[in-house]
Amino acid sequence: MRIGIVGGGLGGLLTTALLSKNHDVVVFEKLPFVGGRFTNINYKGFQLTTGALHMIPHGNDGYLAKLLRECGCNVKIINSNPDGLFRVNGKDYAYKDLFNLVGLKDKLKALKMAANLKMGNVDKSISFGEFLESVELALKVGNAFTGWALSLTAYETPMEEIIEMAKNYHKFGGPGVPIGGCKGVIDELVRVIKNNNGVIKVECEVKGIEIEDDKAYIIGEEFNEEFDVVVSNLSPKLTEKISNVKIIKGKEPKPSKGIKICVATKEGLIKHNGVLFTPECERINGLNQVTNVDISLAPEGYHLVMTHQTQLTNNVKKEIDLGLEDIENLFNGKDYEILHIQSYRDEWPVNHASNGTDLDNVINDRLYLVGDGVKGKGGIEVEGIAMGVMKVVEHINLLNKTN
Ligand SMILES: Cc1cc2nc3c(=O)[nH]c(=O)nc-3n(C[C@H](O)[C@H](O)[C@H](O)COP(=O)(O)OP(=O)(O)OC[C@H]3O[C@@H](n4cnc5c(N)ncnc54)[C@H](O)[C@@H]3O)c2cc1C
């Protein structure tokens, strides 16, 4: 089949790489570079990013890693060990040790919660915040986790999503960092697509998607190309806006917003390669120091620390100032330099659909959606994208067989 892919973000490129084995594929990307919110920006020798924090939520064992291997990408992903620690009262604790920081009554409550969550024995209709709120520290820790991983507060996160995430965590484990950062993944996807004779067109903005009974068309200012199938890597809302198909039939997906601050430090802030969750910060939910995995992500003699925070109010300046105050407290007298502050919202958010508000990937036999507006259930960030891509690729390959 001839397949057109609109958008060269992680979702679009992963779909293209998988389909390029058996189909003719063409990617249309509006920017001069591919990778969307998952690629590097070189700034003074530091590998900053267009979005992601150089982390893959289930590391070398999750959905994304599996699909990368399946399409022939050689990406080395180093699993974090420990997955994450939690800074409470200035000290870093493993998850299991947090239970000892509260009184006996709260400890029993928290242990019961953890056991119920592991067994899926919880009310699916409530939020994660409601589930945790009877133990103050548990709610703070929950907020740090959802803020870091989903750019949502615990109260904004549906319990149903948390149950699925817990299942994935027990199946695949915690995060990992790809060597070369986000761009390490994107470069390999591009290599595979080109090896399979796929075509990637940059600076090629798509203005229209026309779906007819027997064909589909991708239209720009100076082109109108015919395809058997179109895969859109744009948000469901934008895809609907430029196409002749009604996509959002029920509730609109709700985007999640966030702020990332990149910090240079000679001394380093943490010794491990996992996440440092910061439940006691005013705004920062967590941070990582990716140079503990790959020193090439910063100039010689430096570490790169990336912090993330949910955007809680619409006053972005105030949100950033509170984040900077947190950083000052976290560094506690150590030398550091703020490299870059990025806020993510509107057309360039953390997620086009916050977890629990994603739409389905399959619109009809000719039009499919991939990306973070259509993640699989319980799929954190790029793992959720990979789950959606898997579904689309299976559907298209089945369609090809039956036609
Ligand atoms: C601050 C922050 C931190 C994050 N941290 C992580 C993390 O550590 N780990 C993780 O797994 N995820 C993380 N994420 C989320 C992850 O970066 C995104 O979910 C993912 O990159 C989105 O990929 P996508 O393919 O859905 O969309 P995009 O990357 O947005 O790709 C869509 C592409 O379509 C192109 N496009 C748009 N309109 C048109 C048009 N009309 N014509 C042609 N092309 C068009 C865009 O230019 C873009 O390249 C983070 C996100 C942010 C913002």
Regions found by a protein language model. Name each.
Residues 2-27:
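N-terminal Rossmann-like FAD-binding beta1-loop-alpha1 element of flavoenzymes
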Residues 17, 26, 205, 209, ...:
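C-terminal structured subdomain/cap of oxidoreductase catalytic cores
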Residues 20-44:
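Glycine-rich FAD pyrophosphate-binding loop
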Residues 40-49, 57-110:
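A conserved beta-strand/loop capping segment in the N-terminal third of enzymes
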Residues 84-164:
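Rossmann-like flavin
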Residues 165-215:
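Helical element adjacent to the flavin cofactor pocket in flavoenzyme catalytic cores
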Residues 208-303, 310-314:
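Mid-domain catalytic core of redox enzymes
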Residues 290, 296-403:
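Conserved flavin/dinucleotide-binding core of flavoenzymes
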